[in-house]
Amino acid sequence: MEAETECKVPGVYSETGIPVEDPAPGLNSDVSKKDAPPAVAAPGPGLYFEIGKKARDLLYKDFHTDQKFTLTTYTNNGVVITAASTMKDEAIFSEIQTKLKSNNVMLDVKATSDSQVLTTITTEDLGVSGLKQIVSLPFPYQTAGKAELQYLHDYAGISLGVGLTSKPLVNLSGVFGNKSVAVGADVAVDTSTGDFTKYDAGLTINNSDLAADLTLNNKGDSLTASYYHLVNKESGTAAGAELTHSFSTKENTLSFGMQHALDPLTTVKARYNNHGMVSALIQHEWRPKSFLTLSAEVDTKAIDKASKVGLSLVLKP
């Protein structure tokens, strides 16, 4: 997991609300790069940023080259408190996060070591089943607040995000189809200039053990195809690949990887790309919801350089 050097604001580009997928045995499903709270599985195609998520999680999730410690505690009245500290390049970044849920409202307050505070209020089933509201209010950057509406339907997933400024950035994404086949688009407009800052499109095909995705990104400048295959559900054995082509630079990037559960509590993953980067990790659930992850990265084209090693310890008593 990479250390975040600034207070990330969910909202316009939020991944809050992504349905949690069943992980392979031993694979950490509770700790994600976005720290998104768990949500009920979407009845239909989900939201746009879920296109290609299975392959991305296999290829990139839990690989890290820093050292991170996370401790989560639970109070009797339902408050969840998480303290995390990350060391990278001799710099230490820390944060403390408090979550409290009452009925359908979740209050999330996060304070970081660089004196930033982010308050996020999430309201589920806002008058209509499947409708969610997310409001993010950072401090001291009050003008960077964001509000988002997400709607999940059997045949659609729609998200509308608006920055809380006089001339905000507006982001609209939609996915239409079902759990097997869906198409979607993601568009962002800067209302201060009238310019499109993003326009992406995607296609996804899924079944219980296969996922194939095709996305057009970076305003049409890059095309990404990804593939995920759950080879054996009992052992958690899976394989995946991702190919990205840049039309402007004519450059191709190919990554492929595999994962396998050595036992119900231990998972190994490996990844390789055509630039010669090799990564591997082993993750062990040494007690319920507590994980120790050791990962390493080596540049095979510069083998004389020192390899990078990452360590993550997550404790949930």
UniProtKB/Swiss-Prot annotation:
It is found in: Mitochondrion outer membrane. It comes from the Eukaryota. Residues 1-30 are annotated as: Disordered. Disulfide bonds: none annotated. One of its GO terms (cellular component) is mitochondrial outer membrane. InterPro entries: Porin_dom_sf, Porin_Euk, Porin_Euk/Tom40. Signal peptide: none annotated. Belongs to the eukaryotic mitochondrial porin (TC 1.B.8.1) family. Forms a channel through the mitochondrial outer membrane that allows diffusion of small hydrophilic molecules. The channel adopts an open conformation at low or zero membrane potential and a closed conformation at potentials above 30-40 mV. The open state has a weak anion selectivity whereas the closed state is cation-selective. This is Mitochondrial outer membrane protein porin 4. It comes from Oryza sativa subsp. japonica (Rice).
